[in-house]
């Protein structure tokens, strides 16, 4: 297991500092990219990301962890709109409760075997 720190470019997070005590939720997503790694994702978000998306941490199958955004910053990870199928999928239970501002985002890498 290795730990990396590779801070994402400004597109991925808010530069305004937040207090860690304001964090109430942990959001876990998966990248859906077969074979990707924590380090590769952190490298991409540090140099190649042009969209307003990001995550605080990436974790891969080997157990490697890459920190991409400091915990006192807000990652653009949760989104702002409900998906159209939220009633069927059971999603949106935390819509407007869990936000970018009050959550830490973790992306799981290569977990779609």
Q: Residue locations for each model-derived region?
A:
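Active-site-adjacent loop/helix surface patches within enzyme catalytic domains
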Residues: 2-113
């Amino acid at each position: 297991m290795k730990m990396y720190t590779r801070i994402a470019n400004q597109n991925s997070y808010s530069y305004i500092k937040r207090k860690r005590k304001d964090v109430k939720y942990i959001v876990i997503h998966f990248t859906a990219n077969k074979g990707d790694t924590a380090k590769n994702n952190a490298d991409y978000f540090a140099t190649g990301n042009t969209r307003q998306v990001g995550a605080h941490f990436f974790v891969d199958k080997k157990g490697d962890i890459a920190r991409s955004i400091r915990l006192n910053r807000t990652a653009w990870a949760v989104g702002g709109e409900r998906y159209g199928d939220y009633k069927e999928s059971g999603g949106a239970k935390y819509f407007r409760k869990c936000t970018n501002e009050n959550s830490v985002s973790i992306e799981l890498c290569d977990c779609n075997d």
